[in-house]
Amino acid sequence: HYGDPKEWLQKGDQWDTVMNYDAFMEPLTWFLTGMEKHSDEAKPQLKGSVKDFEDSMRHYMASFQTSQLLCAMNELSNHDHSRFMTRTNEKVGRAATLGTAAAEEGIKPAVFREAVVVQMTWPGAPTIYYGDEAGLCGFTDPDNRRTYPWGKEDIVLIDFHRDIIRIHKEHEALRTGSLMFLKGDDNLRGDDNLRGDDNLRGDNNLRGDDNLLCYARFNRREQFVVLVNNKEQERDVELEVWQCGIPKKAVLERVIISNETGYSLMPKQYEVADGVLKISLQKYSAVILMYDRSEN
């Protein structure tokens, strides 16, 4: 649905929900790629801007009742827009002007996996457009309707989808839990030419052009912390996680991590001290951490 769906949703006797462009696909695409969802325009100033991402999400999510939001179709790609994998190459144009091969050039699978992590942990109904799970590329309609890549699938990406879908289905907090943007401090590593706004020590809102998205999904039993580092540098993060109900002294379990080389389900523990989590994030990575009260 294009435009504000409020008039169709607020009475409860017309639409149940919508294809969630305004409150999911578009803000996430701007944040991770700086691209418009058709690949028709680039806005570099929006890439990595947590402020713009959060403001957009809060504004457009307000058009939904909770029940409508939780079943909204949260897509990364579909039949009307360029494939999200293609958007990661940040090429502006269409197949008619750039050629179909350009849709596959310079793509960033790690950024695509970051998007899938958000898709599977954000309020709504994750909806996968055929072929996305196999790494299919394509500019906007009709190039986005390519044949499924039989025999040429990205097997690692398929396995990743299978595992993160399982995680989504196994944990109610990721489906119906509350959502909270988390606050903290971070510091980039491995870059001798940091801009002033890249060193965020003392900034308690993680706002600005920082390419770092941190939020929680939680209910009374489980608390999940999701961190996405969409930057080409590693970074050390100190995150206030007590706000989402995690005890001030606790141990969080890593559920999954995605990075430039792939993904891993290898468990790892992180200590929380005085309500603060300290964690090092690899470049172009996404991490899901969990605290389960029933086991503590």
Outline where the language-model segments fall.
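Solvent-exposed beta-strand/loop surfaces of large extracellular or lumenal domains
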Residues: 254-276
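C-terminal beta-strand-rich structural cap/linker in extracellular carbohydrate-active enzymes
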Residues: 268-296
